[in-house]
Curated annotation (Swiss-Prot):
Residues 28-240 form the MIF4G domain. Residues 678-695 have a biased composition (Acidic residues). The lineage of its organism: Eukaryota, Metazoa, Chordata, Craniata, Vertebrata. GO terms for biological process: 7-methylguanosine mRNA capping; mRNA export from nucleus; nuclear-transcribed mRNA catabolic process, nonsense-mediated decay; regulation of mRNA processing; regulation of translation; regulatory ncRNA-mediated gene silencing; RNA splicing. Residues 1-26, 664-695 are annotated as: Disordered. It comes from Salmo salar (Atlantic salmon). GO terms for cellular component: cytoplasm; nuclear cap binding complex; nucleus. Disulfide bonds: none annotated. It is found in: Nucleus; Cytoplasm. Component of the nuclear cap-binding complex (CBC), a heterodimer composed of ncbp1/cbp80 and ncbp2/cbp20 that interacts with m7GpppG-capped RNA. Component of an alternative nuclear cap-binding complex (CBC) composed of ncbp1/cbp80 and ncbp3. This is Nuclear cap-binding protein subunit 1. The gene is ncbp1.
């Protein structure tokens, strides 16, 4: 069917004439297209399109009522940016067909209950807001909406429920008031005052332990980093003070007031929020990201204040556009730039602030990080005359505020910035950042510039970075990524193992077998063994050094050469690292030879884990070891650690999935056996054999899951134990020397601890009891314990 016709917004009459000759499925597709695309570009006004579409749908109700109901319920949930367009459409249909209006309201309430039970809280929020706007369209009676809100707010009186549950229901009420507050206040002012007083009381007694963990900046100037409910409540208070006058929401139903006010209204059925269950996963609290105010956009329209409800509405709509179109960057960018009412606001500033707000959202952004990079690149292409300047202004602001920026967000900023530069020939006014050269190397600004250049080098090559950066920045340019092979120079021939290294190199070049190479390696003296020691050889660090340095030296040409070398000599590497000390030492050797090439270190460690030459706990122990202390605050170290944790988590999930699938298969077989119980005996015997095999498989998988979970728990114990030891030593040392403990290193370390909790919160929650009993006890220094308490508060 032609898609071109669907874009005609004013073809109501024509489509009705053609409908009789169409197939039912084709008509249903056409109805869906007409509904989904109403309000998009058209030669006619939105009002005439809505009136025409209402006429088409009314005529189709006798045959396609259920389909129309399903589509309208779906768009209420999936296209929140067009909410008022669809509420007006439903209002027009209700005015023409009262029974349909009632059925739609019932269907929406059913859908709301289902989404809440399924933990789909964002969808539920859109449905609540849609129901609210139906009050404006004279579909739902205002008193029944107030009654629903009262039931929502009553959740704050429940005992023994997580705070995040009450938070969601309060947020659902407050975030709907910009749309419906005026109507409800006019009809039920006493009840609305009482409702807001109850919310006020709840917000005053609400715990906010979690806030420091979620703030992008620790400083409150120039913009306070407010908790999301506090900020929204302040916006609603100002809206109420302004007599609920809001000027930014598109309200197409006003044009149909004379028709809609004649319609009969429906009462919402009594709505009781579903009870709290242990498996409920409520949305985490947030902190509202602020980067700009009216002083940053001096020309053009004025940016609404942070406590103006217009700011909330604009940001909410922009978030909704990103949520609806994030998989298609071109569409997403075009939709953002064609935002309704764009001439009344400094749109570019709002878009940039919203995008960075999502990118820096803690614990994790709503979408993958690279999406925001590609979206900003697309926006720069579409608005080359204005958006790049706003983006540069934002980058400069973030650079200036690096000292108080959360380390997790600095990671995301440098990833975005380096990727962005790589798409624009690495052009940047580096001289504007010359102030960082006068600071200590461990301060956030020089550290940020150095890490950005390191990341840029990954996306190009060393000489390119040398060429693009002013000579004054030479101290921050990454080192040339060369390989350090200590057995290369004949001047080092006196080194222990030198002769064997030469022999191993020749053996590898001559395609010697693993056995032959192991025979050559037997000549390597063991520095850990006394001359008169008659026992077995044990752990020999020199043997690992001689073999691995030589192997990686011969394979140093590229990543793929190195991967092939590790794969080819996997058996030897496994033999050399059969103990924990061996695993640690192989990691040390990888770092020693490639210390000027962090990316190579990262990918080789990744390969060693994948091929099970080293385990995840060994990587954690190595990263926290004294030999890596000087690298502890480097970006790539944390890249390796988080990658290691993710691998462990995926491994556990994979085995758990296999176990669940085996259990499901057994259940299906047993169910089938019960159904076919009248069949022959030999079939029964085969079935029993299959059941027995599956039961054995389930038992084996159960053991594997328990073993993997034990490894996973041990990995987190190792990581948190090392953090506690390092931070405690630092705090004691500072207290003993009477110096301020709050150094750049301390800020980095404590925020890296927060990062572990935030990035892996779902997994860590399984082991809270163990962590509390063994590590995060009451005796722990309160600075460290505070991080754990903030984490616990995220889901309380």
């Amino acid at each position: 069917m032609s898609r071109r016709r669907h874009s005609d917004g004013d073809d109501g009459g024509q489509s009705h004439k053609r409908r009789r000759t169409s197939e039912p499925v084709e008509i249903e597709d056409r109805l869906e297209s007409l509904i989904c695309r109403v309000g998009e570009k058209s030669t006619s006004s939105l009002e005439s399109n809505l009136e025409g579409l209402a006429g088409v749908l009314e005529a189709d109700l006798p045959n396609y009522k259920n389909k129309i109901l399903r589509i309208l319920c779906a768009v209420a949930r999936l296209l929140p940016e067009k909410l008022t367009v669809y509420t007006t459409l439903v209002g027009l249909l209700n005015a023409r067909n009262y029974n349909f209006g009632g059925e739609f309201v019932e269907a929406m309430i059913r859908q709301l209950k289902e989404t809440l039970k399924a933990n789909l809280y964002t969808d539920a929020l859109y449905l609540v807001r849609f129901l609210c706007d139906l009050v404006n369209c004279h579909v739902i009676a205002a008193p029944s909406m107030v009654a629903m809100f009262e039931n929502f707010v009553s959740v704050t009186q429940e005992e023994d429920v997580p705070q995040v549950r009450s938070d969601w229901f309060v947020y659902a009420v407050l975030s709907s008031l910009p749309w419906v507050g005026k109507e409800l206040d006019e009809k039920k002012d006493v009840e609305m005052d009482r409702l807001l007083n109850q919310i006020d009381g709840y917000l005053k007694r609400r715990l906010k332990t979690h806030v420091p963990m979620l703030q992008v900046w620790t400083a409150e100037k120039p913009h306070p980093q407010e908790e999301y409910l506090d900020c929204l409540y302040a916006q609603i208070q100002k809206l109420k003070k302004d007599r609920w006058q809001e000027r930014h929401i598109l309200r197409p139903y006003i044009a149909f007031d004379s028709v809609l006010c004649e319609a009969l209204q429906h009462n919402l059925p009594p709505f009781t929020p579903p009870a709290h269950m242990p498996d409920c996963q409520y949305p985490m609290p947030r902190v509202i990201f602020r980067m700009f105010d009216y002083t940053d956009a001096p020309e053009g329209p004025v940016m609404p204040g942070s406590h103006s409800v217009e700011r909330f509405v604009i940001e909410d709509n922009l978030h909704n556009i990103i949520k609806s179109h994030w998989k298609e960057r071109k569409t997403c960018a075009a939709q953002l730039l064609s935002y309704p009412g764009k001439n009344k606001i400094p749109l570019n500033y709002h878009i940039v602030e919203v995008i960075f707000g999502e990118l820096f959202q803690l614990p994790c952004p709503p979408h993958i990080d690279v999406m925001y990079t590609t979206l900003l690149i697309e926006l720069c292409k579409l608005q080359p005359g204005s958006l790049p300047q706003v983006l540069a202004q934002a980058t400069e602001m973030m650079y200036v505020r690096l000292d108080t920026m959360n380390t997790i967000c600095i990671d995301r900023l440098l990833n975005w910035f380096s990727h962005h530069l790589s798409n624009f020939q690495f052009r940047w006014s580096w001289d504007d950042w010359v102030d960082c050269l006068a600071l200590d190397a461990d301060k956030p600004k020089p550290k940020f510039v150095k890490e950005v250049l390191e990341k840029c080098m990954r996306l190009s090559y060393h000489q390119r970075i040398v060429d693009i950066v002013p000579p004054t920045f030479s101290g921050l340019i990454p080192a040339d990524p060369i390989f350090f092979y200590k057995y290369q120079d004949e001047a080092n021939s006196a080194l222990p193992g030198y002769a064997v290294a030469i022999a191993v190199g020749n053996a590898i070049k001559n395609r010697a077998s693993n056995e032959e190479i192991l025979t050559v390696l037997k000549d390597v003296p063991n520095p850990n063994q006394e001359d008169d020691d008659d026992e077995g050889e044990g752990f020999n660090p020199l043997k690992i050094e001689v073999f691995l340095q030589t192997l990686l030296h011969l394979a140093a040409k590229s990543f793929s050469h190195s991967f092939s070398a590790l794969a080819k000599f996997h058996e030897i590497l496994k033999a050399l690292t059969d103990c924990d000390e061996g695993k640690l030492h192989i990691l040390r050797v990888v770092y020693e030879v490639w210390k000027n090439h962090p990316q190579m270190v990262s990918v080789l460690v990744d390969k060693l884990i994948r091929t099970q030459i080293v385990d995840c706990a060994a990587v954690a122990n190595w990263l926290f070891s004294p030999s890596m202390a000087h690298e502890f605050t480097r970006f790539y170290v944390w890249e390796i650690l988080h990658s290691t944790i993710r691998k462990m988590n995926k491994h556990v999930q994979k085995i758990q999935k296999e176990l669940e699938e085996a259990k499901d298969k057994l259940e299906r077989q047993q169910h089938k056996k019960q159904k076919d119980s009248g069949d022959e005996e030999d079939m029964e015997k085969n079935s029993e054999d299959e059941d027995g095999q599956l039961e054995e498989q389930i038992e084996r998988l159960q053991e594997k899951v328990e073993s993997a979970q034990s490894e996973q728990k041990n990995l987190f114990l190792v990581i948190f134990q090392r953090f506690i030891m390092m931070l405690t030593e630092h705090l004691v040392r500072c207290e003993t020397g009477s110096v301020d403990f709050s150094t750049p290193w301390y800020k980095n370390c404590i925020e890296r601890l927060q990062q572990i909790f935030l990035m892996h919160h779902v997994t860590i929650q399984q082991y809270m009891g163990t962590l509390e009993n063994l590590l995060f006890t009451a005796e722990l220094d309160h600075h460290i314990l505070a991080v754990y308490q903030q984490f616990c508060a995220l889901q309380l």
